[in-house]
């Protein structure tokens, strides 16, 4: 017997916790009925609320789940509180009941009508109806939802009636109100009623307001009535006043009142279309006992039962004793001896029931089952979501570029752990902070702050990796570029390989990035709008570019919600919950280059003015500090991440976004909206707010924002009404105090911080409070157990409990986003070990530089983690990484072996060849014949590869079904290797092993394009080609072997392998009897004969010097020994075997041809193949002639030992790659791993996932270093101050006043460290005059001068003059010939008359002016003069002059070719002299020590020479250019000096000169040319030989040659040095005073004379020019403006002035290549014939542009698909040569 009791009050547990846990369980797939009930109950309640009058409907807030109402105290204590509590009680009953049965698989829902009765009190009685009507558990959601709706209507009616008896106060007091019922113990109902009648008659109480008995039991009586009358009763009545009485928690009104309610009220409650429809389907099954009589209700339909129950609740008093009597009577009437009482926690009625069972039925055993207890039990096994909408979201990968040098999460954590505040002045690569900053806020368009937090070198980008041309990269927003880079890194960390699993289906991966500005497009690229202005600048292209590059077909969203954009993008998890995608890449981006935004935010009073990141929660917080940042995260549903074997960094439990609609202004935060959001998000996540132990707050450092946020946080997570225990501390922090406010990336940055905190188990110190805490913060934070971590605080894992945190991210536009994040579960240790003995580790890259970097990083990782599992490493680098065209694969069995092999590849990386871009090589399967393996094998593949084992066992089953014995003993190692099995077993084993191997290779993605089988192997080949089924192949092999055993004598004949050609054999053996069985190769032949005949042959051939090996076979195949079986074998084959057309070409060693048709292979063919010779040599040669095979193919030997591939290598002149499947005597896994590595490096795309699948449960993804990018800077510098002026003149007067010695600055778009201001310029069609002025005291210029110190003075080196010349030359060419391209500049005839020395007083300016004049640009010459400017603004006579001669770098390269071998010869001679101890070999440190001691002390960045070999006045040096940043240059002086100052070194250090008495300085050179750019970090070699001149022995001349990779790429020709006595050093090189006109240099040759050059001055070049001037043709090709930028990029301006120049060849193909190079921003050297245009960044847009240029300039009409039809440079050249030569 069963009794289910439903109470009229909630269990004494924490009600909110019960509902929260039920909500969490409803997401579990084990509770589908529970989830359905909550959904249907929610819908039912919504329908009821919608039907209310407007006034009542407004009292119920919107709710997403019926359970959410439990947290709404205001509603539950309001007018409809009784209705809501009734709903919640019924919902709790039914949900708990459903969950109880779903949680326990042993419990069955078996409430039968015979032995079950249902009882309940008050609202609990309604819950019994749902059970009574439900024949199964699956019906409870429907009946339960109906009960919920009726419970609500009951509550509304009760409220309506009760309000008429005693209205609620107009101003509600805190709390639920007064009680409508009191219980009086130890009295009789008769006494109570008598007293009530006496008082109410005396007071003439109106009938509806009378107090009445609503419930009675053996121990007490309950009286009910309006609260005021109840209070009056207990006040005026001595009877009641003197007795103990207790108010019950009945606050919603009256029930059990027959004098108030009638049938009308009952009908109002049960009138429902839902009830009518249910009545037709459901009928009462289980008896429900009346609480007034104890007898079952008599209703026969659902509606009748509801009517009876509602009438009972409204009009009948509760008499629990009657209910107990009814239950006891049913127990007596039944045959049961025990009773299960189902309860919702124990209670007084339950105790009374059990006590009665004990007294009245002593032989009857009654026990309780608590239906609530299951709710709090831990899940075992772990919960699985019932659907995608219920999934948790795993974060499986992250990458970042954040301020403070945080180029990865580890560096970011270092910054946080150190408590750094990484603000700094706005760097020069963004804009000139000095000119764009005004602390007083008075200047138009200026920023009020000079500070921010910035990414280092945001222009760094590996353009070729992402198939972008340099030009496209330059014009593409760095936010887009870095989003690409970090997305790749995050995906790499996550081990995401598209299409590896269902969750990584490329069609189901989407991207979601937050971005709130387009700075680079608005400022940088807007200076020069070109092809990629839209695609590179508009933010929608950022996520789209990621999808396009990775070939993801899911959605791509760019999200802009202002400051919360990034975390709003993290709500990509909503797409995961909705099932729109399986994997999401989400994040935020922000790179600040637009000074307008600084000015706008300053004027809006958003920004702090003080030098700090955000002063979060500080008393003086005055705004936020802007910040860069790029973050990418990879998200998956948790169950998918676990199934994919991912590393889980954290788990998102819930995310939500709302808006502060009620704020006082759009930008003002609103604590109420924030609190509502976080409360809702936490509740949806199923988390108790007190389980949150950390909140990463938005915390921008504004007074209003910080104060409002702490209010919302304390309200939800640390309220006064409910206190946290001492074990529930809550910490708060904000990453903005460290790295500033990244705006659109601030949310993802905070999330990365949180994930690192989980990982490091620590909370970093909060560094935002610089003085004292914000006075608006609550003063009782400590009492609330809420803490700010002023120092790093441990945050350890707690066994059995998860750390949970909240991340807040709010928007200045009013949006609020909150995310609940839980730490990942600790992964269970692997249960076993990977049985494979050898593991394949791969490394790949898209360039040699990156390959080298990746190898170095992996080696460093293995050295730092010597215990790393090689199996894990192999799994990570193969199955969990993308693979590129530069590939390295290493099969290793231990770490030492791995490091050694990786080191070997690292040494040879420069000669590494990438895989061809033409696609995968075709594959040939070559099937081995008999005799290659041991008689017995022990195949590790059979033991450890489930796939191979299953294939082999299936084939064995086919063999046994045909009557053959099992061949498994041949391969399973159950016998010694030498054990001889029957020929049938051996031959079946061979063929079946080969078939299984072929299928195994195919499972790994290696499918044959051609097959060839040797002897017995041909049967396996025919099967793989589709000619034979596996069953037929086994049948033929087995029958043939059986016939051989029956009709041929084992051992009577032999086969002899001879290392000789057939012709050689014939010439030696003459007429001795033998047969030729196999012609395997040019010198590989197999003979057959009787044992005696073979013995003679062996003796003769060995005597002739030929190696002979007797094959270990039972029969002499392909010889006369097989004649007895041929007829029968052919007949059996004809009758039983079905031959199908081949689906692959078959190379036939029998016929010596390639088989394509369906008729050739038949019974006759296999008969002949048994008897006739195998002509493997002839077959391969024919196949090659027919082009069936070629040198590109990959050969795989399918068999027990490599034989055929050795034959192939001896036949073909070149074999791409040839690998075995198994090698005799070698562990199978070692062979397979090595072969897979070779195939991988040959370009085959392998199914690595399948290779590791069987072992994956024992494998883990290793957190390896990320890809080593081959970065170069691509950056368009914002030039000038046009963002300030915007065409206005309001700054002109200010500039003139600040610089009285200069003209008003004209608006030029050029500014570098040495060319700071164009003060005058005049341009005509072909002539120009430009005058620039610079202050030597500016930091970068001064630092460059002090980098070259002589006599303790900063001396402007000639390389600085060269940089000025390059800058002005480029500027003039751009102005006069804006479309020019590929023009180099020769800085010729430099003559320095006075040294320029930095003054000591840096407080005063030290100006110089340089004038540049071009008479006719088409003559290709410009003339420059340098002048000092005195303090009064007067310009001195020129102290230096030079010419710029424009020319073609290609011509220069050609002109240097004849000298190359001479220079190389001299270098080699110096090397030999050094080895002989004659020449001096000096290290880097020694060379510069000597240089500094003798004359010049160079700064570190100038010290490029790594070693010097010197003999007398001849030397060469190996040079590496620095990567150190600093300054804006066209050609950094320290680059020029590093490759050129070898000449000065020789003159001032060589023992051929008397350096003790003399020193040497250069007055100039004849020519300086660089045909290729000087690039940071690259290596060069300089060579010079200085020779004294005949005219003056104190003057020396020489040519400095600069080589790269053995090619001369630059020259400083006719460089001159003059020798001076050392006693003059102090006189010549001393710092001047502030008036530079008084300074006289060592080379002063003329008296001071004031010279002011006007715009009309004409200078005639009379000096001999070192190279022929180039006539500049009319501009034709559009190209980007040459802009000096950061050092790494700008060097290109030296050799490439983006202009159309005649090329050296007149062919259309050559012109076309030059045009392609120009359009893509490439060098011609970047266009080898095998270069793929797609990899060079030639996309569809560029294709259209180039096609148009071809038409306009070359007269070649093509369409935009040209580069698809001719994908490589060689293809296009060939086409152009064929049709346009």
Curated annotation (Swiss-Prot):
Biological processes, Gene Ontology terms: fatty acid biosynthetic process
Top EC class of this enzyme: transferase
InterPro entries assigned: Ac_transferase_dom_sf, ACP-like_sf, Acyl_transferase_dom, Acyl_Trfase/lysoPLipase, Ketoacyl_synth_AS, Ketoacyl_synth_C, Ketoacyl_synth_N, Malonyl_transacylase_ACP-bd
N-terminal acylcarrier protein transacylase domain (SAT): annotated segments: 15-253
Stretches the record annotates as Product template (PT) domain: 1312-1631
Keyword field: Multifunctional enzyme, Phosphopantetheine, Phosphoprotein, Transferase
Annotated spans, Malonyl-CoA:ACP transacylase (MAT) domain: 925-1244
Annotated metabolic or biological route of this protein: Secondary metabolite biosynthesis
SMART domains: PKS_AT, PKS_KS, PKS_PP
Sequence ranges assigned to domain Ketosynthase family 3 (KS3) in this UniProt record: 390-823
UniProt-annotated catalytic positions: 563 (for beta-ketoacyl synthase activity), 698 (for beta-ketoacyl synthase activity), 741 (for beta-ketoacyl synthase activity), 1348 (proton acceptor), 1537 (proton donor)
Reaction(s) the record says it catalyses: holo-[ACP] + 8 malonyl-CoA + 8 H(+) = atrochrysone carboxyl-[ACP] + 8 CO2 + 8 CoA + 2 H2O
Domain of life: Eukaryota
Purpose: Atrochrysone carboxylic acid synthase; part of the gene cluster that mediates the biosynthesis of the dimeric xanthones cryptosporioptides. The pathway begins with the synthesis of atrochrysone thioester by the polyketide synthase dmx-nrPKS. The atrochrysone carboxyl ACP thioesterase dmxR1 then breaks the thioester bond and releases the atrochrysone carboxylic acid from dmx-nrPKS. Atrochrysone carboxylic acid is decarboxylated by the decarboxylase dmxR15, and oxidized by the anthrone oxygenase dmxR16 to yield emodin. Emodin is then reduced to emodin hydroquinone by the oxidoreductase dmxR7.
Protein name, per record: Atrochrysone carboxylic acid synthase
Organism encoding this protein: Cryptosporiopsis sp. (strain 8999)
Gene: dmx-nrPKS
């Amino acid at each position: 017997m069963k009794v289910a009791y439903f109470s009229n009050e909630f269990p004494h547990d924490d009600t909110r916790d019960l509902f929260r846990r039920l909500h969490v369980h409803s997401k579990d797939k084990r509770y589908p009925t529970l989830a359905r009930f909550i959904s249907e109950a929610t819908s039912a309640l919504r329908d009821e609320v919608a039907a209310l009058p407007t006034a009542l409907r407004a009292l119920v807030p919107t709710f997403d789940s019926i359970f959410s109402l439990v947290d709404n105290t205001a509603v539950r204590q309001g007018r409809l509180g009784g209705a809501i509590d009734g709903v919640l009680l019924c919902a709790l009953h039914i949900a708990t009941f459903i969950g109880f049965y779903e949680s326990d698989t042993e419990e069955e829902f078996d409430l039968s009508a015979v032995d079950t009765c249902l009882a309940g009190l008050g609202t609990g009685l309604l819950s019994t109806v749902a059970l009574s009507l439900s024949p199964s558990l699956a019906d409870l959601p429907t009946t339960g939802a109906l009960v919920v709706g009726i419970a609500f209507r009951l509550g509304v009616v009760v409220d309506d009636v009760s309000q008429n008896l005693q209205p609620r106060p107009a101003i509600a007091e805190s709390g639920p109100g007064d009680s409508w019922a009191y219980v009086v113990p130890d009295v009789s109902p008769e006494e109570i009623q008598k007293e009530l009648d006496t008082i109410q008659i005396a007071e003439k109480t109106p009938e509806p307001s009378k107090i009445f008995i609503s419930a009675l039991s053996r121990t007490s009586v309950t009286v009910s009535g309006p609260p005021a009358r109840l209070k009056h009763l207990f006040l005026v009545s001595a009877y009641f006043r003197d007795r103990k009485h207790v108010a019950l928690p009945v606050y919603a009104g009256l029930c059990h009142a027959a004098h108030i309610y009638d049938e009308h009220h009952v009908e109002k409650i049960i009138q429902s279309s839902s009830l009518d429809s249910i009545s037709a389907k459901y009928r009462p099954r289980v008896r429900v006992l009346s609480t007034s009589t104890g007898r079952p209700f008599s209703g026969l339909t659902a509606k009748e039962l509801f009517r009876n129950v509602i009438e009972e609740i409204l009009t009948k008093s509760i008499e629990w004793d009657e209910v107990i009597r009814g239950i006891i009577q049913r127990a007596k009437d039944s045959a049961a001896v025990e009773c299960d009482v189902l309860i919702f926690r124990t209670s007084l009625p339950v105790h009374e029931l059990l006590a009665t069972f004990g007294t009245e039925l002593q032989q009857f055993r009654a026990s309780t089952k608590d239906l609530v207890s299951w709710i709090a039990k831990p899940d075992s096994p772990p919960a699985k979501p019932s659907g995608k909408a219920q999934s948790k979201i795993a974060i499986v990968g992250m990458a970042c570029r954040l301020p403070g040098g945080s180029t990865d999460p580890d560096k970011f954590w270092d910054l946080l752990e150190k408590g750094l505040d990484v603000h700094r002045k706005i760097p020069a690569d963004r804009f000139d902070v000095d000119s764009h900053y005004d602390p007083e806020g008075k200047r138009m368009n200026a920023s009020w702050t000079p500070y921010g937090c910035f990414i280092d070198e945001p222009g760094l980008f590996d353009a070729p990796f992402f198939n972008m041309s340099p030009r496209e990269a330059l014009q593409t927003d760095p936010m887009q570029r870095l989003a690409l880079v970090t997305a790749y890194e995050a995906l790499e960390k996550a081990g995401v390989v598209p299409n590896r699993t269902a969750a990584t289906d490329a069609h189901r991966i989407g991207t979601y990035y937050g971005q709130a500005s387009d700075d680079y497009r608005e400022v940088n690229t807007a200076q020069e709008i070109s092809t990629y202005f839209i695609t590179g600048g508009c933010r929608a292209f950022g996520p789209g570019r990621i999808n396009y590059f990775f070939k993801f077909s899911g959605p791509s969203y760019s999200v802009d919600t202002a400051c919360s954009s990034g975390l709003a993008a993290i709500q990509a998890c909503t797409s995961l919950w909705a099932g729109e995608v399986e994997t999401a890449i989400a994040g935020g981006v922000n790179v600040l280059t637009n000074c307008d935004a600084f000015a706008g935010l300053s004027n809006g009073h958003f920004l702090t003015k003080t030098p700090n990141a955000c002063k979060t929660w500080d008393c003086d917080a005055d705004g936020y500090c802007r910040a860069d940042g790029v973050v990418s995260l990879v998200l998956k549903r948790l169950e998918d991440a676990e199934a994919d074997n991912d590393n889980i960094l954290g788990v998102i439990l819930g995310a939500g976004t709302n808006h502060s609609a009620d704020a006082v202004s759009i930008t003002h935060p609103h604590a109420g909206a924030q609190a509502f959001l976080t409360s809702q998000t936490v509740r949806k996540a199923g988390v108790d707010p007190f389980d949150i132990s950390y909140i990463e707050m938005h915390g921008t450092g504004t007074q209003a924002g910080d104060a409002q946020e702490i209010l919302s946080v304390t309200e939800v997570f640390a309220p006064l009404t409910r206190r946290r225990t001492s074990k529930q501390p809550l910490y708060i922090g904000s990453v903005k105090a460290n790295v500033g406010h990244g705006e659109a990336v601030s949310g993802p940055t905070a999330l990365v911080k949180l994930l690192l905190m989980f990982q490091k188990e620590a909370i970093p110190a909060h560094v935002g409070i610089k003085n004292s805490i914000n006075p608006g913060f609550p003063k009782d934070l400590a009492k609330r157990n809420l803490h700010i971590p002023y120092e790093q605080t441990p945050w350890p894992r707690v066994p059995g409990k998860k750390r949970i945190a909240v991340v807040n991210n709010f928007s200045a536009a009013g949006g609020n986003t909150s995310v609940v994040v839980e730490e990942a579960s600790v992964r269970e240790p692997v249960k076993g070990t990977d049985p494979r003995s050898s593991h394949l580790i791969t490394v790949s890259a898209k360039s040699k530089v990156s390959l080298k970097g990746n190898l170095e990083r992996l080696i460093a990782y293995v050295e730092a983690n010597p215990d790393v599992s090689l199996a894990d490493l192999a799994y990570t680098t193969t199955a969990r990484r993308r693979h590129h065209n530069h590939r390295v694969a290493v099969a290793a069995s231990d770490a030492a072996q791995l490091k050694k092999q990786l080191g070997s590849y690292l040494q040879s990386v420069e000669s590494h060849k990438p895989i061809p871009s033409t696609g995968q090589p075709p594959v040939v399967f070559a099937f081995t014949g008999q005799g290659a393996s041991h008689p017995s094998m022990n195949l590790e593949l059979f033991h450890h590869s489930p796939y191979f084992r299953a294939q082999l066992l299936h084939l064995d089953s086919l063999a046994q079904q045909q009557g053959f014995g099992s061949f498994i003993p041949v391969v399973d190692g159950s016998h010694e290797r030498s054990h001889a099995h029957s020929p049938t077993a051996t031959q079946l084993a061979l063929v079946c092993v080969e078939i299984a191997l072929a299928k195994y290779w195919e499972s790994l993605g290696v499918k044959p394009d051609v097959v060839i089988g040797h002897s017995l192997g041909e049967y396996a080949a025919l099967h793989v080609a589709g000619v034979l089924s596996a069953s037929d192949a086994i049948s033929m092999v087995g029958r043939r072997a059986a016939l051989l055993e029956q009709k041929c004598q084992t051992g009577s004949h032999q086969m002899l392998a001879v290392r000789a050609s057939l012709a050689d054999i014939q010439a030696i053996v003459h007429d001795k009897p033998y047969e030729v069985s196999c012609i395997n190769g040019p010198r590989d032949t197999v003979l057959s004969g009787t044992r005696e005949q073979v013995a003679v042959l062996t003796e003769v051939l060995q005597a002739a010097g030929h190696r002979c090996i007797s094959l270990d076979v039972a029969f002499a195949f392909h010889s006369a020994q097989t004649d007895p079986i041929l007829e029968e074998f052919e007949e059996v084959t004809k009758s039983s075997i079905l031959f199908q057309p081949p689906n692959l070409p078959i190379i036939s060693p029998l016929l010596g041809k390639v088989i394509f048709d369906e008729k050739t292979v038949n019974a006759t063919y296999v008969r002949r193949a048994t008897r006739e010779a195998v002509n493997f040599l002839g077959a391969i040669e024919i196949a090659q002639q027919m082009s069936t095979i070629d040198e590109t193919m990959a050969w795989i030997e399918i068999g027990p030992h490599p034989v055929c591939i050795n034959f192939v290598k001896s036949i073909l002149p070149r074999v791409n790659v040839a690998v075995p499947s198994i090698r005799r005597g070698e562990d199978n896994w070692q062979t397979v791993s090595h072969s897979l590595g070779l195939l991988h490096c040959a370009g085959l795309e392998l199914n690595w996932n399948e290779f590791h699948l069987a072992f994956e449960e024992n494998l883990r993804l290793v957190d390896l270093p990320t890809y080593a990018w081959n970065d170069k800077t691509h950056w368009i510098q914002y030039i000038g101050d046009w963002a300030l002026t915007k065409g206005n003149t309001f700054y002109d007067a200010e500039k003139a006043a600040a610089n009285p010695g200069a003209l008003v600055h004209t608006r030029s778009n050029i500014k570098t460290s040495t060319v700071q201001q164009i003060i005058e310029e005049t341009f005509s069609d072909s002539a120009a005059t430009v005058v620039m002025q610079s202050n030597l005291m500016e930091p970068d210029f001064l630092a460059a001068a002090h980098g070259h110190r002589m006599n303790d003075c900063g001396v402007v080196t000639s390389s600085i003059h060269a940089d000025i010349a390059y800058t002005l030359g480029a500027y003039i060419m751009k102005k006069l010939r804006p479309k020019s391209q590929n023009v180099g500049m020769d800085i010729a005839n430099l003559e320095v008359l006075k040294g320029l020395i930095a003054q000591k007083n840096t407080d005063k300016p030290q100006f110089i002016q340089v004038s540049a004049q071009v008479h006719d640009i088409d003559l290709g010459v410009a003339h420059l003069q340098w002048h000092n400017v005195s303090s009064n603004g007067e310009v001195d006579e020129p102290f230096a002059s030079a010419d710029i001669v424009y020319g073609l770098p290609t011509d220069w390269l050609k002109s240097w070719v004849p000298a190359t071998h001479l220079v190389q010869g001299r270098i080699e001679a110096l090397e030999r002299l050094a080895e002989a101890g004659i020449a001096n070999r000096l290290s880097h440190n020694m060379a510069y020590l000597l240089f500094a001691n003798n004359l010049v002390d160079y700064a570190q960045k100038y010290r490029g020479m790594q070693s010097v070999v010197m003999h007398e006045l001849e030397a060469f040096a190996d040079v590496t250019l620095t990567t150190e940043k600093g300054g804006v240059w066209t050609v950094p002086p320290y680059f020029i000096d590093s490759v050129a100052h070898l000449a000065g070194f020789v003159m001032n250090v060589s023992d051929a000169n008397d350096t003790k008495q003399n020193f040497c300085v250069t007055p100039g050179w004849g020519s300086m040319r660089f045909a290729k750019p000087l690039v940071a970090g690259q290596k060069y070699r300089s060579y010079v030989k200085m020779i004294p001149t005949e005219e003056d022995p104190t003057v020396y001349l020489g040519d400095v040659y600069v080589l790269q990779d053995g090619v001369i790429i630059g020259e400083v020709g006719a460089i001159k040095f003059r020798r001076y006595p050392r006693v003059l050093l102090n006189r010549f090189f001393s710092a001047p005073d502030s008036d530079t006109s008084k300074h006289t240099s060592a080379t002063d040759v003329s008296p001071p004379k004031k010279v002011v050059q006007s715009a009309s001055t004409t200078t005639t070049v009379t000096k001999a020019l070192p190279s022929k001037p180039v006539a500049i043709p009319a501009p034709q090709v559009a190209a980007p403006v040459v802009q000096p930028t950061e050092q790494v990029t700008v060097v290109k301006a030296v050799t490439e002035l983006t202009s159309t120049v005649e090329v050296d060849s007149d062919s259309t193909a050559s012109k076309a290549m030059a045009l392609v190079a120009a359009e893509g921003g490439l060098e011609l050297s970047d266009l080898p014939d095998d270069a793929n245009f797609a990899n060079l960044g030639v996309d569809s847009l560029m294709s259209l542009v180039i096609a148009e240029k071809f038409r306009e300039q070359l007269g070649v009409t093509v369409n935009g698909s040209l580069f698809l039809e001719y994908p490589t440079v060689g293809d296009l050249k060939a086409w152009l040569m064929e049709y346009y030569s």
